[in-house]
């Protein structure tokens, strides 16, 4: 059966994401962490394009969904995990190995759960922080340390703890916004333009603030919901 060439187009973006993920791993193993980290960010851009291209060309397929998940494991699971290990994890021996490995495992679980719940969950939110967001948070920490040098012996332990936290958040039931499903309007368009302008001027700092707020938003929202549930239970008791 002949294959429609259009089906290859979105998968080319996915394959490119895997390629960048592998390049990131190679650079990390050579201790070229800045390049390794920015390659993960570049993979995020490609990851956001493949699904949109598939929908625009009407070439969505089960193969594309599974291929995208495998790409995410490489680019947003293995790559940031090894960046973590080569950057600070090796200083902690087996603990560093375990933390790096757990990040990949939790990320794979997150992707598997996403694939089986896509048609049943709220399309405007994710259950658990998405693995691309977790990966970008990891590499942004490394990039910030390369620029501002805040990781020392004690703070390196906190960094590993942060990696564990991201892993737990990926498999948690805490909801995070799904920006792929936002409804565009003039106000949002202006906000995006402002954001892109800030990224152009100060890319690292702007992305770090944005992703930090994204991370905290989910946790604070969850805490408010827990307090509300407890309050309602006490009120009805």
What are these regions (language model features)?
Residues 8-15, 56-111, 141-143:
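Multi-pass membrane catalytic core of lipid/isoprenoid biosynthesis enzymes
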Residues 1-18, 53-73, 112-133, 173-186, ...:
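Interhelical loop and helix-boundary elements at the membrane-water interface
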Residues 1-48, 187, 199, 221, ...:
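Topogenic membrane-insertion module of multi-pass membrane proteins
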Residues 123-237:
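C-terminal membrane-associated helical module and adjoining short loops/tails
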Residues 48-55, 104-116, 155-173:
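Hydrophobic, membrane-facing alpha-helical anchors
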Residues 23-38, 74, 78-99, 140-158, ...:
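Helix-coil boundary and interhelical linker segments in multi-pass alpha-helical membrane proteins
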